[in-house]
Amino acid sequence: MSKAWKLKLLLLLQLLLLSQHDVDSASVISYLPGFEGLLPFHLETGYIGVGEGEKVQLFYYFIKSENNPEEDPLIIWLTGGPACTALSALAFEIGPLTFKTEGYNGGLPSLVSTSYSWTKVASIIFLDQPVGTGYSYSTTPLSYKPSDTGEAKQTYEFLQKWLVENPQFVSNPIYVGGDSYAGIVVPAIVQQISIGNEHGYKPQINLKGYILGNPSTDLDSDHNSKIPYAHRMGLISDELYESLKRTCQGNYVKVDPTNTKCLKLMEDYGKCVSRINEGLILIALCDLASPNPYSGEHGGRSYLQTLVQSDLSLPTPDCYMYRYLLASHWANDEDVRRELHVVKGSIGKWMRCNWDLPYEKDIKSSVPYHRNNSIIGDYRSLVYSSDHDMMVPYIGTEAWIKSLNYSITDDWRPWFVNNQVIGYTRTYANNMTFATIKGGGHTAEYKPEESFMMFQRWISGRPL
């Protein structure tokens, strides 16, 4: 081979390497369609390949702390579902942007800044996980079903590779966080990281703890706690509650079909709560369709979300689901996808929650993971519940925490903001803090200021 050809070949290889680097590297986003002017924070988006042959490409949004990103904690955050996009957390719950619902008259929805973003004091990776969620995709048809344990392994692999690409964050305190169904997966991710660190896998992850909001823990137990919760909140009578307890023996999920008395009482219970918004029992249900989209017969939240995604029955601006419609319009816009550097043709229609994704719920309870994590590592944990959330009632969360038999170091007491009671808290010897948010719903979006104050105090090591 001539010297000239060797030089050409070398140049070609260099170009290929540079091209590959451009594909793998994150993109810094300074402008977003719908937001006026420069973004007032540092946003990156990108993909990281995981699994066999890196066929699974996980999409993420990364926002640097607006305070001191060199030293502030780094959080990897998972949305619930399963298969609800990270954009939900970023735009509706704990991020620095949200959709403007007032005055929308068609076209691309507008984005506005929020006042209580958790990125004011921490850097956050918002991850579209599992594959098939948000903008995450697979380069080939999957030969397996995404699952809880699979998601835990892939999230650990993602974090390792992200830190290799961003070594400046390796020494930052790292936390894993999530809400709703992520309560099943986050403790398993913590265990994966712990095992990896123990085996000396590189990079070592400077894991300090985890954060769970209104977390699912054991789906049957979570559901069973709705009956006593409904009684505590005055949604069912004393007589009905006592009859349910006695006749159904505390099992309201898998009712024996021969127990006709229990089935009849469950019907009576359904009549009492069928028009209650489980996400926040204080607000009205959206009358998008009949029968009630929150009834178990139609899959609850997933049925309501399907209506929004199908455009068959659109919510009005006063409906809490209206912003989800705006998110769908925005995330499916070609200009938006181009600015976010979404791989063209990688997914079809973007959905806030992909309820049709085949998914194996192979972790029946995350309680054993909590136990293991308290033994493996000296981790801090924050578990918070809003007292008006009926999707995952706080009394079920209190029950599984109690089952861990941790000793109490700071007993039940109110916590305050501006001398007002915001909720109640209790701290345990294993560095677990439990907190309630008074008047809140299923996610932080219903009480953004209070949720931020709780997070800010806890992440800085101060008592609530």
Swiss-Prot record:
Subcellular location(s) per record: Secreted
Question: Can you supply a Gene Ontology BP term from the record?
Answer: proteolysis
* Keyword Glycoprotein set for record: yes
For molecular function, the Gene Ontology terms on record are: serine-type carboxypeptidase activity
* Positions of glycan attachment: N372, N405, N431
Disulfide bonds listed in the record:
C84-C353, C248-C262, C286-C319
Coiled coil start-end: none
Annotated signal peptide: 1-25
- In which tissues or organs does this protein occur? Expressed in roots.
Work out whether the entry's keyword set contains Secreted. yes
Domain of life from the UniProt record: Eukaryota
EC number, UniProt record: 3.4.16.-
A single GO CC term for this protein reads: extracellular region
Where primarily located? secreted
- Enzyme class of the recorded protein, top EC level: hydrolase
SUPFAM superfamilies linked to this entry: alpha/beta-Hydrolases
User: What keywords are annotated for this sequence in UniProt?
Assistant: Carboxypeptidase, Disulfide bond, Glycoprotein, Hydrolase, Protease, Secreted, Signal
Question: What positions constitute the catalytic site?
Answer: S180, D389, H442
Family assignment from sequence similarity? Belongs to the peptidase S10 family.
Q: What does this protein do?
A: Probable carboxypeptidase.
The protein's name in its UniProt record: Serine carboxypeptidase-like 18
Organism whose genome encodes this protein? Arabidopsis thaliana (Mouse-ear cress)
Q: Which gene encodes it?
A: SCPL18
